[in-house]
């Protein structure tokens, strides 16, 4: 098992994991934006379990928070896209890394 740093600022440390066993590999991205380190650690993985951000849903949540006068929650929701990958971004990264299978998790 290898732990590696991922980009989830402002939360630090944040890590992903690579599990290698008998020539097979599974990478779990954890909460992250895309980064060269994630791509490198996902290189050639049999399975990449990657998070995905539904930006439209987060945007709807932000609008609802604003409508209720909850500026703190609106700010949190406005910042979420800065440290999470979209499904398309994760798919592009998985292709670049040569991962054989991408499984989405942690749908934000």
Name each model feature, range by range:
Residues 2-13, 21-24:
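Flexible, acidic/histidine-containing loops and adjacent segments that form or flank the divalent-metal
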Residues 3, 29-32:
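N-terminal post-signal-peptidase region of extra-cytosolic proteins
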Residues 16, 25, 33-108:
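Cap/insert and terminal regions of metallo-dependent hydrolase folds
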